[in-house]
């Protein structure tokens, strides 16, 4: 743990890891990088990993954009809502969520829902997994007669595996 951090919420998806913290100290950047580096036993410097820090309203606005699907690889991608909820649940279980981050997550989910319901982002129902399946169907004749190898067991793999009558082999280390 980091003494200067009061609350922590980690959002991890297939293409992002975001760490939201609440602290009475103005900047915990160096402490956070040092903690992650020590925890994972890797050296983190500007050339080895891309990271950025946001503070206050910028960080809150960013999570709202993420929750609305407007900051996704696939614009409007709906899976992020469940990923935020699951990350929140994990942080709650670990007792790292307090009043500040609880409010931030709830406001972000509410705002994200409002954006989806009042804009065209809500009309986009495809996930990356379903788009992969659609593209595969276009590229290959009769996909149901083919075997598919999926490396990994992430959320996209789970979506592909759940499709009926398609023979899929999934491997992960």
Model-assigned labels for residue ranges:
Residues 133, 137-173:
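Glycine-rich phosphate/diphosphate-binding loop of Rossmann-like nucleotide-binding domains
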Residues 1-72:
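A glycine-rich (often HGG/GG-containing) alpha/beta subdomain
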Residues 46-146:
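Glycine/serine-rich phosphate-binding loop and adjoining beta1-alpha1 elements at the start
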Residues 4-5, 35, 103-107, 153-156:
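Short hydrophobic/aromatic-rich motifs at helix boundaries and adjacent loops
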Residues 5, 114, 168-169:
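A broad structural signal for short, well-ordered beta-strand segments within beta-sheet-rich domains
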Residues 30, 82, 158:
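Alpha-helical elements of the RecA-like P-loop NTPase motor core of helicases
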Residues 36-37, 91, 164:
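Hydrophobic alpha-helix position signal
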């Amino acid at each position: 743990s980091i003494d200067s951090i009061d609350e922590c919420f980690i959002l991890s998806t297939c293409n992002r890891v975001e760490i939201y913290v609440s602290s009475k100290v103005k900047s915990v950047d160096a402490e956070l990088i040092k903690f992650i580096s020590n925890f994972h036993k890797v050296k983190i410097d500007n050339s080895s990993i891309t990271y950025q820090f946001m503070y206050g309203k910028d960080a809150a606005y960013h999570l709202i954009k993420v929750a609305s699907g407007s900051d996704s690889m696939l614009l409007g991608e709906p899976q992020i809502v469940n990923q935020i909820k699951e990350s929140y649940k994990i942080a709650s279980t670990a007792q790292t969520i307090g009043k500040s981050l609880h409010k931030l997550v709830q406001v972000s989910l509410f705002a994200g829902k409002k954006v989806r319901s009042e804009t065209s982002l809500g009309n986009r129902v495809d996930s990356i997994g379903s788009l992969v399946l659609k593209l595969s169907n276009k590229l290959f004749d009769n996909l149901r007669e083919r075997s598919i190898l999926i490396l990994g067991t992430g959320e996209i793999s789970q979506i592909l595996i759940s499709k009926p009558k398609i023979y899929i082999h999934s491997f992960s280390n």
